[in-house]
Amino acid sequence: DSSTSRGLGDVYKRQVCTGMPGSLPVLNKQVVEYALAVGLAANCRINQYCKFDRKNYFYPDNPQNYQISQLYLPVCRDGWVDIETESGLKKRVGIHEIHMEEDAGKLIHDEWEDCSLVDYNRSGVPLIEIVSEPDMRSAEEVIAYLEKLRLIIQYLGASDCKLQEGSMRADVNLSVREAGAPEFGTRTEMKNLNSFKAIARAIEGERRRQIELLEEGRQVIQETRRWDDNKESSKAMRSKEDAQDYRYFPDPDLVPVVISDEWIARVKARQPELRTEKIARYKEEYGLPEYDARLLTSSKHMADIFEETTRLSGRPKEASNWLMVEAMRLMKEQEMEPEDMEFSTSHLAALIRMVENNIINRTVAKTVFEEIFRHDADPEAYVEENGLKVVKDEGALRDTVKAVMAANPQSVEDYRNGREKAMGFLVGQTMKAMKGKADPSMVNQLVRELLAGGDV
């Protein structure tokens, strides 16, 4: 029922979301469709008869003292996704189930040392929870799996999946065992993980902690632990319960959901192109290499920018190069995610046309692109205002080349003695003198002509 989970103060809190007396829950149809879409994309079996249960527990972020969830008949079961790690390992990770539930509030622990705050803005917000099989054996595999799920969900439009904002969360259950041991060890659950890097560090930290306990002859306690990424350590929050401790029973206020074949067919027909299909199309339709196609589709937002820029400019390889080289460089410098890019695709398309039509050269274009990237500048207006158009006045270029050659007689002599690299130096100095605005082909031609003719 809550319209959003992001706000200051309890601005989005509703009576039904916090279980106020007299309020009754209402099923959000959209979350059912999102759950079906994700389940289909993750190769799940759809439960065409599913229902809701109450998970009973007391905690400050849960004013109802129960959470509406699905234990016995979740919407999806028995799925899988294929992953590939950065080191090249390929494997299939099973999905035990996908269920729908309502979100709890958010506890804020780091504002004051002696108390915690409770934010109920996200209480009652519908979410889907993906329960994974214990198939992953390293932090690298976990990150590859989460990245795969994030891309699926983003491409489906079910969520923007921003960990730092809480629209995607991951609780990591981890245990260790001796090599060859048939049974899993005692697991702990790690919370407060708001980035993939934090997840990887938490996994490594908890792995070391559990191994140290066992090597010292102590037991691992089944508990929920809170990860502190600044200290790179965790502390116990509460004991970890099993399902029977929550005293699940069917929610009496919500009727079962019957999912017809026709409903599934409608959801399937609306499924958008996912990353795997997009990679194949980029290679076939645009002639992009595998690496380029993978990088451009590693974010739905990046793929959208690429496709729209290509549509406007008609130059897929140029659009790809600007995004893969310059945009990636600037994102790294500013510690940005692809989803943070906000410039207009029409501006990037205009820049591509300006380079193609030799209105500006590539050196200047890089400067202009930075303005587009940082401030969404109109490239045509920016070039005009700053006098950055390519200088094609042969007389002015010839005079500049002569001045550069006169200032560098040793390079002129080196070239005439057979050292071809000296010409590159003179071209570079000319471009520098022209502040990058000269036509490189004209500069090359004039330098070669003047060196050959001895007219310096």
Model regions and ranges:
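Strongly charged, low-complexity linkers/loops
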Residues: 338-349, 353, 359-432
